[in-house]
Amino acid sequence: MYKKTASVLILSTILLAACSKEEPKAALDCAQPATLQNIRTTIEDTLKQQARSFARNDNRQFVDADKIIAAGLELETLLEDPKETEDNGKAICRANLKIRIPDTILKTAIDNSPLIYGNTPLSDMLEQKLMGSNLIFENNTFSTTLLYTPDKDGKPVFEDNTLSSTAQTLSATLLPYGVKSIVMIDGKPVSKEQAIKLLQNQNTEEPPTV
């Protein structure tokens, strides 16, 4: 009787020990194609919203929103070194986001910036927006770090607003690219080059806040 009872107790202990062991969690798939596609969609949607909002509110009508939207399709967006890491005991994905603006697009934005940002150079505007953030702009490229967790469909759930703030800064950078070739100054059509010269020599109308 004792041996039988002891055997039952031993078996129960083994079963309980087996049940109490936690099954190892599956590794996060941080490099799913859906992640990069989601990022690109977020950027393109933000560009579209910001460009249309500015064009709608600017009574000077200097900007063609469609030009900015088209420029967004030419951006080179990369997600580098995606890997699983841990944040406060939670398994998450970490990756480096890089968004490169083509040379011709950035040059046009810089040239047109006086019609949008007045006497503030595009580089100074960017410096103000980057201050205090983990976003870097160098060699035509925005760089930052994203933290996210893939959902059951592989789409990323981001841990903070880094992506949205990056997209907004990118939108502000590309906004001057959308300046029309011919704009209206004092009711007269002039080339954007002439408009820049005119506006640099006088106080410009305050543009909508970007």
Feature annotation, model-predicted:
Residues 16-18:
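C-terminal motif of bacterial Sec signal peptides marking the signal peptidase cleavage site
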Residues 7-8, 210:
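Short amphipathic alpha-helical "recognition" segments used for binding
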Residues 1-7:
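Bacterial N-terminal signal peptides that target proteins for export
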Residues 8-14:
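Bacterial N-terminal signal peptides
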Residues 20-210:
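Cystatin/cathelin-like cysteine-protease inhibitor module
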